[in-house]
Every structure is written in structure tokens, then in C-alpha cells.
Amino acid sequence: MNKLRKVTLSFILSLLLITGVMPAGTTYSPVVSVEAAVSKKQTAKFVKAVDGDTAKLSVKGRTYTFRFLAVDTPETVKPNTPVAFMGKRASDYTKSELKKAKKIQIQYDGNKTDKYGRKLAWIWVDGKLLQDKLVKKGYARVYYIYGKYKYTDTLKTSERKAKKKKLGIWKNYSAAFPD
């Protein structure tokens, strides 16, 4: 009987710890900081541009493929797919920006990898967000938003301005993104 009492008491204590002890009618909502998911910036070195939204960068001596978070550029290297409108310009711009950069940094925000094993990150070039530069010039659309990323609002503002001016992909969106 003593063992049963200990098990029951342990169960009740565990239940109280899990649910919390609150007066009736009190609602509980955990405080979650969006900032907590955003990492500190890490220095990277340019290795190779894959296309407009993907590059190989070296971090702490190891080379990784980075997919730029929250943007999509027209295709240039997708198998069995022709180069899309503005795809080459987006790729050339990314390569140029990364190649001439004095300082490249990466910053994680949420999931660190995608389903293909590529690293997902914000890419900073000489203190400026590369994704925002791509969007401002009309080389990329804001895309693949899976949650509240730190710089999404900045990108959406830049996208609205680029659309309004019909820059880059916004001149012929269906040719840039035919699917």
C-alpha cells in the first residue's frame, strides 16, 4: 500500500509540474521570443555561386551549400528546365556581390537546413543583407516563408517597391516563374 501511495503522489506531482499550478480561469501562454531562434552572425568565405539564391560558403574551414533564406530567384541550374527570365542576371549579381565582398556573414533563423541538406541562412555582404539587395533590384521574390523570420517585413517592403517600379522579374513574372 505504501508503494501505491508513492506512485500516486509521484503521478500527481508530475501532473502539477507539467500543467502548472494555476487558479481556475487563468490562461497560460508561454512567452516565446522570436529573437531566440536567430543566431549570431558568423564569418564566412565565398567559394562558389550556384545560382541566384544558393552559394557555397566556407564557415570555420568547412564548405557548405547555403540556400538564401526567404527568397527565390528564377531558375538557372534546375535539370531539364530552361534558364528562366532574369535567372542569369540574378545568378551573376549574387556571384558578383559575394566575390567582391570584403566581409561575408551568415545568420541562422529557425531551421538550419532544408530537405536537401542545404544550410538555410541570412547572408550578409559588407554589412548589408544580400536577400534584400536581390529583392530591391527585382532579382528575387519573397518566398518560402515558414514562420516569423526576423527580416521578412524588410523583404516584403522591398518587394512591394520593386513590384511597383516593375523591376527585374516584375516586368514579366510568368516568364521568371513559369510553374
Language-model-derived ranges and their functions:
Residues N2-D179:
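Small beta-barrel nucleic-acid-binding modules, primarily SNase/OB-fold domains
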